[in-house]
Amino acid sequence: METLLSPRALSPPLNPKPLSLHQTKPTSHSLSLSKPTTFSGPKHLSTRFTKPESRNWLIDAKQGLAALALSLTLTFSPVGTALASEFNILNDGPPKETYVVDDAGVLSRVTKSDLKKLLSDLEYRKKLRLNFITVRKLTSKADAFEYADQVLEKWYPSIEEGNNKGIVVLITSQKEGAITGGPAFIEAVGENILDATVSENLPVLATDEKYNEAVYSSAKRLVAAIDGQPDPGGPTVKDSKRESNFKTKEETDEKRGQFSLVVGGLLVIAFVVPMAQYFAYVSRK
């Protein structure tokens, strides 16, 4: 009995902790190189990945919904469509088989065919390439000139590439256009013809929504200048003078005289007739 109830005999089953430490000691020794006190990296990674997964799921869901909403907005809104068209023109680069990027969809097949014949002949003879771009509306740039410069720099990044290139941009909603190009192109056309084409051919005809004529007449005028031919000139500006609703001075004076006569006659009748009736009544008595 004493042997069974002695403290030494009871110590192993009542105190298993030292035995547990002794058994796990080799494992602890083998992982001593990855202790948090030695390397802070595993500690931070451990903390990051032990966060509740439900919270990360909610954050990802919110970000996904926000991205979806933004994508739908850009896809179906007019601003998003216009913005996409502008950047598509920049990223797609210059047209290879034609000389026209009709993003606005306002040019006919006949106009595109005539432009291809005219501009391909120009490129073959003069080694100058001229491209036309139509856009409905600008949202990324303030005006057509800024956008034209942006297209030129994007399509032809170096001076050597853009030296003999020219770009004509027509904004249909704003009824305006712009022309830009490399040094060789600008010198071949001349500043006067460039200014005249931008201020006459493009805006005047675009205002009447004659986009085909605006583009083709501009091309012919630029090609004529490059070939040294006489300037065909711009379109004839129609006299849009409207009839005024206001009377002239002469008409006003004439109406005023007639009005005075009528008023004077009415006043005479108003005073004379009662007086005549009064005197007639008195004379009878």
Curated annotation (Swiss-Prot):
Superkingdom: Eukaryota
Keywords: Chloroplast, Membrane, Plastid, Thylakoid, Transit peptide, Transmembrane, Transmembrane helix
Record bears the keyword Lipoprotein: no
Subcellular location, record wording: Plastid, Chloroplast thylakoid membrane
GO biological process: photosystem II repair
Biased composition (Basic and acidic residues): 238-251
Pfam families: TPM_phosphatase
GO CC aspect terms: chloroplast; chloroplast thylakoid; chloroplast thylakoid membrane; nucleus; thylakoid; thylakoid lumen
Alphabetized GO MF terms: acid phosphatase activity; mRNA binding
Ranges of biased composition (kind: Polar residues): 22-40
Segments traversing the membrane: 259-279
Chain residue ranges for the region called Disordered: 1-48, 228-251
Protein's membrane topology: Single-pass membrane protein
Annotated PANTHER family: UPF0603 PROTEIN YGCG
Record-stated family: Belongs to the UPF0603 family.
Name of protein: UPF0603 protein At1g54780, chloroplastic
Lineage: Eukaryota, Viridiplantae, Streptophyta, Embryophyta, Tracheophyta
